[in-house]
Amino acid sequence: MTLQEQIMKALHVQPVIDPKAEIRKRVDFLKDYVKKTGAKGFVLGISGGQDSTLAGRLAQLAVEEIRNEGGNATFIAVRLPYKVQKDEDDAQLALQFIQADQSVAFDIASTVDAFSNQYENLLDESLTDFNKGNVKARIRMVTQYAIGGQKGLLVIGTDHAAEAVTGFFTKFGDGGADLLPLTGLTKRQGRALLQELGADERLYLKMPTADLLDEKPGQADETELGITYDQLDDYLEGKTVPADVAEKIEKRYTVSEHKRQVPASMFDDWWK
């Protein structure tokens, strides 16, 4: 088995999917998991990007089906901007599409800036822009878990195969969640699910960005990665990609393995 095939298997990627069937499987997963845990529903941060839009709509469909079947579950969508978000219109469009039971908004700027200032005062150095970006992601995680803990809700994560293979998420930030309904999907497969669900194409054709950097607001994921999502998707779907692209992907996969594992102990061997 080639490394490419090993990665596809590890990340549960199917080269070809049926979007309607995938929606059904993922909604059922959300329903089954919330029932098994005894939780009261879900909470998820909504950015206006493809991934949170898809996960949010799946979550809302799941809680509606639970209620229609005589159960009780709710979904809270959370806006978590840092000051004024450049693509706020997209976030509002996503909320209109998702139709969450409840939507709330937290501006994380005061918390992030207060921490950054205290860090600088105590350690006599400023956080790097990259590190501050990770603080933003982790404050967003803290906010979602505060809501979830208060109301008995599970935190949904938006990680999918194209992010997982590169480790393109913040450890214990957007990587911190209770369940991951998008696991195994490539970026283009996620788009196909949103198309099937009837989303406005603006929500899945827009340029993907983590938008965590003050110095490079709205920087494209592909710029930061040095790899396009089409290349990532082709690789993950078992297609042939240029040798240098495959090498980049496989290197990122190897060095980011710790992000896909629970914290290491001396009894684990995955890191050796």
From Swiss-Prot:
pH-linked activity: Optimum pH is 8.
InterPro entries linked to this entry: NAD/GMP_synthase, NAD_synthase, NH(3)-dep_NAD(+)_synth, Rossmann-like_a/b/a_fold
SUPFAM superfamilies: Adenine nucleotide alpha hydrolases-like
Function text: Catalyzes the ATP-dependent amidation of deamido-NAD to form NAD. Uses ammonia as a nitrogen source.
Pfam families (alphabetical): NAD_synthase
EC number of this enzyme: 6.3.1.5
Classification lineage: Bacteria, Bacillati, Bacillota, Bacilli, Bacillales
GO cellular component, one term: cytoplasm
Residues at which deamido-NAD(+) binds: 138, 171, 178, 258-259
Family: Belongs to the NAD synthetase family.
Subunit structure: Homodimer.
Protein's name in the database: NH(3)-dependent NAD(+) synthetase
Annotated source species: Bacillus anthracis
Catalytic activity as recorded in UniProt: deamido-NAD(+) + NH4(+) + ATP = AMP + diphosphate + NAD(+) + H(+)
Ligand binding (ATP): 45-52, 158, 187, 209
GO BP annotations listed: NAD biosynthetic process
Signal peptide per UniProt: none
Keywords noted in UniProt: ATP-binding, Ligase, Magnesium, Metal-binding, NAD, Nucleotide-binding
A GO molecular function held by the record: metal ion binding
Pathway per the UniProt entry: Cofactor biosynthesis; NAD(+) biosynthesis; NAD(+) from deamido-NAD(+) (ammonia route): step 1/1
Binding site for Mg(2+): 51, 163
